């Protein structure tokens, strides 16, 4: 059995989806720690990236419900892929704001959610943005937070590709 077959079989069990969900919970907890304990103000792009990460979590829950059922498994895989791809695009745009600042290319001043789902009004402690997208407020191993998110979302897409192949 090849490693790709092993990964594919692993994705048909609950443990794989639980690990993905725990991965999301860990990174969301880190985001809230940075915001509420370290007092780092999240920007609009940070909030959108946070929502993309939550999309990965929702996909993990869908896959966790019935991993042997092809419909639930594929819905989970597709949701994981779409959320990771959108998160990667948002993180890359955020990196661009930080490393190529321009008065003509800036992020929005306020988060904009649909009127039927105003997350920033329902849970402002999680979804309200009041930081500057172009400001680098935290670094680890010489990478800013959006650069780490590029690594994380790209890693998700690579893991997904290895599982699906």
From Swiss-Prot:
Function, as annotated: Required for disulfide bond formation in some periplasmic proteins. Acts by oxidizing the DsbA protein.
UniProt organism field: Vibrio alginolyticus
Family: Belongs to the DsbB family.
Gene Ontology biological-process entries: protein folding
Membrane topology of this protein: Multi-pass membrane protein
NCBIfam families: PRK01749.1
Domain of life: Bacteria
Disulfide bonds: 43-46, 107-133
Official protein name in the record: Disulfide bond formation protein B
Annotated compartments: Cell inner membrane
